């Protein structure tokens, strides 16, 4: 019997890359591959790359240097190792990757993962195996479905891609060039995927897309569903305890999405809503097509519909031309909104984007200083948000065993990790926890009540405490 070939995938960047990596594993599993945690043991290594920031791209080439050594060692052992570069760096740089790193066998963009078996066969015959086109067919219709065993092994939370690409063309962003124009998956395929996940133990669904709330998918009756309408449809599927979505653009928040937050307890009151800057002038240079006041109005609409809602965001400091006054406007917006969490970055020029050609670059020293000030404000807000949980009872979805024996870790509605001493038969349940203290960014508490263990793949979740 021929032993299975071993596959190692290393993903960089966004949640969609995590999802894409899982789908590549599923597709290659049908070709006889099994995963291995060690790149050096693999017959195929895939780097699933991110192109959002310069450092992410350079990390890929550093990793390829290490893999070249591993590939040479495998050859000395009489074993052939193939190396593939996938993701947004592959899409952006294409054949240049092979020129710069000849050890690479396959280069495949995000829209062509269903062609991986064919590309690997081509590379095995010594033929060029580079595909970075945007094929006409929908890759999701060709990628293999995960096995029941794979779903169960991945845990109680799962990502589901509903939308890809972006038509916003923010001047700093490469996504429209690496992921293409906006494309929404058909409603039926999404509902089928979610149903299969919940039938195999998944309790939390996170819908993902580069601009997820631009979703406009075709329903079986020919109508078009928005993201808000899709949330209602998913909420009706037995076993779905929690629904999240990411990442959103303020301009695409419509009434149906607000209504879903108002009406559906399963839609979590935590929204990642990037704004990037609080300066109208900088937002204009970024081509965000909204101002700071527009963003505040969107936040107000969410809060009016769901008073317990909280927000996270993205911020870029040091965008070309950013003055101290512009930066202070960002700090003012952060102070006005009050965030549960946020991600802050120094501006990194990406080749081919309009911002890369802008003048008036902010110095590295100023960027560092501004990032420190911004992050300090964000950290203080996050600490206050977490501290406010002490003494309250919060619902926690228990996900897995923690490092400490006898302890489980789960997530609150706001994605805060919560650690509780509890039996592992409650994994997959949402249970009330009284929060007693904090440990760095984690909440510590004790169960208020217990419930019957989830007994079987399709058993609906037992939820206590609303």
From Swiss-Prot:
InterPro entries: Elp3/MiaA/NifB-like_rSAM (IPR006638), Methylthiotransferase (IPR005839), Methylthiotransferase_CS (IPR020612), Methylthiotransferase_N (IPR013848), Methylthiotransferase_N_sf (IPR038135), MiaB_methiolase (IPR006463), rSAM (IPR007197), rSAM_horseshoe (IPR023404)
Compartments reported by the entry: Cytoplasm
Molecular-function annotations in GO: 4 iron, 4 sulfur cluster binding; metal ion binding; N6-isopentenyladenosine methylthiotransferase activity
SUPFAM superfamilies, A to Z: Radical SAM enzymes
Cofactor: [4Fe-4S] cluster
tRNA processing in keyword set: yes
Predominant localisation class: cytoplasm
Broad enzyme group: transferase
Catalytic activity as recorded in UniProt: N(6)-dimethylallyladenosine(37) in tRNA + (sulfur carrier)-SH + AH2 + 2 S-adenosyl-L-methionine = 2-methylsulfanyl-N(6)-dimethylallyladenosine(37) in tRNA + (sulfur carrier)-H + 5'-deoxyadenosine + L-methionine + A + S-adenosyl-L-homocysteine + 2 H(+)
NCBIfam families in the record: miaB-methiolase, MiaB/RimO family radical SAM methylthiotransferase
Function, as annotated: Catalyzes the methylthiolation of N6-(dimethylallyl)adenosine (i(6)A), leading to the formation of 2-methylthio-N6-(dimethylallyl)adenosine (ms(2)i(6)A) at position 37 in tRNAs that read codons beginning with uridine.
Name listed for the protein in its UniProt record: tRNA-2-methylthio-N(6)-dimethylallyladenosine synthase
Organism: Bradyrhizobium sp. (strain BTAi1 / ATCC BAA-1182)
Gene from which this protein is expressed: miaB
């Amino acid at each position: 019997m021929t032993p299975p070939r071993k596959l190692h995938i290393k993903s960089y960047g966004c949640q969609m890359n995590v999802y894409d990596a899982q789908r590549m594993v599923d597709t290659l599993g049908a070709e006889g591959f099994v995963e291995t945690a060690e790149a050096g043991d693999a017959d195929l290594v895939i780097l699933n790359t991110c192109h959002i920031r310069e450092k992410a791209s350079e990390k890929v080439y550093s990793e390829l240097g290490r893999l070249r050594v591993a590939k040479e060692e495998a050859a000395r052992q009489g074993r052939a190792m193939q190396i593939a570069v996938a993701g947004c760096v592959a899409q952006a740089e294409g054949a240049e990757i092979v020129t710069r790193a000849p050890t690479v066998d396959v280069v495949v963009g995000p829209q062509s993962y269903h062609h991986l078996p064919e590309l690997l066969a081509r590379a095995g015959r010594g033929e060029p195996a580079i595909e970075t086109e945007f094929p006409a067919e929908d890759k999701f219709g060709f990628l293999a479905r995960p096995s029941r065993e794979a779903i169960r092994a991945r845990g109680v939370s799962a990502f589901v891609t509903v939308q890809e690409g972006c038509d916003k063309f923010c001047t700093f962003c490469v996504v429209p060039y690496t992921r293409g124009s906006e494309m929404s998956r058909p409603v039926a395929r999404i509902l089928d995927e979610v149903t299969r996940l919940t039938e195999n133990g998944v309790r939390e669904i996170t819908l993902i897309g580069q601009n997820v709330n631009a979703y406009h998918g075709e329903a079986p009756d020919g109508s078009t569903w928005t993201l808000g309408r899709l949330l209602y449809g998913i909420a009706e599927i037995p076993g779905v305890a929690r629904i999240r979505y990411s990442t959103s653009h303020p301009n695409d928040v419509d009434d149906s999405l607000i209504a879903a937050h108002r009406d559906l307890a399963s839609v979590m009151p935590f929204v990642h809503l990037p704004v990037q800057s609080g300066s109208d002038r900088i937002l204009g240079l970024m081509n965000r097509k909204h101002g700071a006041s527009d963003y505040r109005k969107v936040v107000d609409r969410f809060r009016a519909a769901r008073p317990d809602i909280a927000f996270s965001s993205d911020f870029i400091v040091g965008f070309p031309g950013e003055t101290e006054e512009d930066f202070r406007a960002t700090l003012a917006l952060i102070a006005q909104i009050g965030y549960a969490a946020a991600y802050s970055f120094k501006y990194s020029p990406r080749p081919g984007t309009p911002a890369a050609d802008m003048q008036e670059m902010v110095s590295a020293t100023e960027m560092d200083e501004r990032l420190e000030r911004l992050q300090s404000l964000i950290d203080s807000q996050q600490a206050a948000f977490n501290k406010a949980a002490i003494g309250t009872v919060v619902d926690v979805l228990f996900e897995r065993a923690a490092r400490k024996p006898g302890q489980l870790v789960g997530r609150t509605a706001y994605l805060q990790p919560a650690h509780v001493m509890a039996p592992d038969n409650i994994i997959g349940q949402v249970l009330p926890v009284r929060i007693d203290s904090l440990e760095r960014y984690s909440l510590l508490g004790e169960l208020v009540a217990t419930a019957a263990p989830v007994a079987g793949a399709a058993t609906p979740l037992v939820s206590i405490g609303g």
